[in-house]
Amino acid sequence: MSWHPQYRSSKFRHVFGKPASKENCYDSVPITRSVHDNHFCAVNPHFIAVVTECAGGGAFLVIPLHQTGKLDPHYPKVCGHRGNVLDVKWNPFDDFEIASCSEDATIKIWSIPKQLLTRNLTAYRKELVGHARRVGLVEWHPTAANILFSAGYDYKVMIWNLDTKESVITSPMSTISCHQDVILSMSFNTNGSLLATTCKDRKIRVIDPRAGTVLQEASYKGHRASKVLFLGNLKKLMSTGTSRWNNRQVALWDQDNLSVPLMEEDLDGSSGVLFPFYDADTSMLYVVGKGDGNIRYYEVSADKPHLSYLTEYRSYNPQKGIGVMPKRGLDVSSCEIFRFYKLITTKSLIEPISMIVPRRSESYQEDIYPPTAGAQPSLTAQEWLSGMNRDPILVSLRPGSELLRPHPLPAERPIFNSMAPASPRLLNQTEKLAAEDGWRSSSLLEEKMPRWAAEHRLEEKKTWLTNGFDVFECPPPKTENELLQMFYRQQEEIRRLRELLTQREVQAKQLELEIKNLRMGSEQL
C-alpha cells in the first residue's frame, strides 16, 4: 500500500488568508496587558470592541468598523467598571448592545449610540450583581433573546434574564454549581439546549443549562483541555489544550460519550493557548494560537478521519487576542468566508485577516454561502426558560434577500431583515413587501397589487443594495482607497443591473410566446 495520504476532494483546499492593507487596519490602539486567556475583542457588522488599559478601573473601546487608520489617543472609552475588564461580547440580536465582565465581580450591559462617541460612556443600561469573585467569561444564548451566561472565579455559571425593567439585577434565574475550579471556556450547541465547559480541574463537561445537571464528563488524563467548542450539528466537541508531554494539542469528542476522544493531534511545543473557531456553514475549523502569528484551518466531517488539515496562515506578528466577524458582516463579492481581527500588542494594531475562497466568477457563490444564522432570535427569554428549544432563524447572505425560516414571535418583537442596514429609508412599505413576499401569501399589500408588480418592486429594492449596503446612503469618498471601493461597488451594481435586464428580456419573450399561443388557440376554436 502506498504511504501517500488518500486524495480528498474539497472546495476549500485553496482557501488563503489575506491581511488588510495598512490603511484598512486600526493603528495606535492601546490593547490590554491582561494575562488572562480571553479573546479581548468582539466584532459585529457595525463596531469593533477591544479591551484596553484604563487608570482607576476597567474600560474598553468601541470603534466603528469603517473608522480605520490611526486612532486618536484621546478616543472616548466605555468605562464604568471598578476593576479590569476581562471579557466583552456583542448581543447577537442587537448590534448596539454589548456585555462586559470585570474583576469587580459585576457584569454590565451597555447600549452603544449609533452616532460616534464624543466623550467617555459611563452610563450602563443594566448591572448584574451575583458573583462573589471576579467574572471571567460572558456568553449570550445563541437563539433566545436577552439570556446571558456568566462564569466567575467563584466556580459558578449564572444565567441572567435581561428581559426585566430593573437596572440592577441581583438574583440570576439559576446557578450551575457543578465545577470544582475556575471555568476556562463555555460553548453552546446550535439551538442552545446544551452547554459545554472546560475547567481548571482538566475536565470537559456537557451540561443541561436549565436543569444545571452534568450529562457527560471527560476526565481523560492524556489531554488537558483549556478551550472547548461545539461543532454545529455534528454532535461532536473540539477541545484544545496540552498533551501529557506538554505539546499543544487538539482533540475531537463524541458529545454523548466523553470517556475517550475520537482523535488527538499534537501541533507544536509552544505554550500559548489555542483558540478554536468553527464555521458550521463550511464545516471548517480554525485554530488560532495565542503568542504566535499562525492560523491553522481544517475541514471537519462526520466520517473518519473526521479532521482534514487544509493549510496554515503564517505571520511574524504574534496575536494576543482575536475577534471574529459574524457571517452576515462578510464581503460575499470577494468570496470571503471568515474574517479575523488580530490584536497585535507589539504594534498597538488591530489587523483584519480575510479567509478567501479563490473563484473566477464574480457572481454570488451559492455553494460556499448556504443559509446562515441571522440576527433575529427564534425564542423569547420566557420561552427558553420554560423548556422550549428552537434552531436559529436562517437568512441568505445574498444581498437584498429575506428571512428563509421565519417563526412567529410576539407582537412587541417585529420581524425584520437582518441583512439590511438600519436605515429609515428602507423601513418603508416596499421593504415590508420584500420581506413578506416569499412566505406570507395573505399580505394585504399583495392583494392590492399584481404579483408581477410586487416582484418588480422587490427586484428594484435589491438593486439598491450592494453587499447589504445602501448605495444612496454612502458618504462621499475621502481617500483614494475609499474611491476605489466605491468604484468596485458601482461595477458590481452595473453587473447586477445587466443580469436583471437579461432576466426581464427573457420574461418578455416568454410572455410574447404565451400571447402567441393563446391567439393561435383562439383562432382554432
From Swiss-Prot:
Coiled-coil regions in this chain? 485-524
On whether Transmembrane helix is a keyword of this UniProt record, the answer is no
Q: Name one molecular function that GO assigns to this entry.
A: actin filament binding
Domain of life (superkingdom): Eukaryota
Sorted alphabetically, the Gene Ontology cellular component annotations on this record are: brush border; transcription repressor complex
GO terms, biological process: intracellular signal transduction
Q: Which InterPro entries does this one have?
A: Coronin (IPR015505), DUF1899 (IPR015048), WD40/YVTN_repeat-like_dom_sf (IPR015943), WD40_repeat_CS (IPR019775), WD40_repeat_dom_sf (IPR036322), WD40_rpt (IPR001680)
Q: Where are the WD repeats?
A: 24-71, 72-122, 123-170, 171-214, 215-259, 260-305, 306-342
For this UniProt record, the keywords arranged alphabetically read as follows: Actin-binding, Coiled coil, Repeat, WD repeat
Q: Which Gene3D superfamilies match?
A: YVTN repeat-like/Quinoprotein amine dehydrogenase
Task: Please indicate if the UniProt record lists Repeat as a keyword.
Answer: yes
Which family is annotated? Belongs to the WD repeat coronin family.
Q: What's the subunit arrangement here? A: Binds actin. Component of the N-Cor repressor complex, at least composed of NCOR1, NCOR2, HDAC3, TBL1X, TBL1R, CORO2A and GPS2.
Question: How is this protein named in the record?
Answer: Coronin-2A
Organism of derivation? Homo sapiens
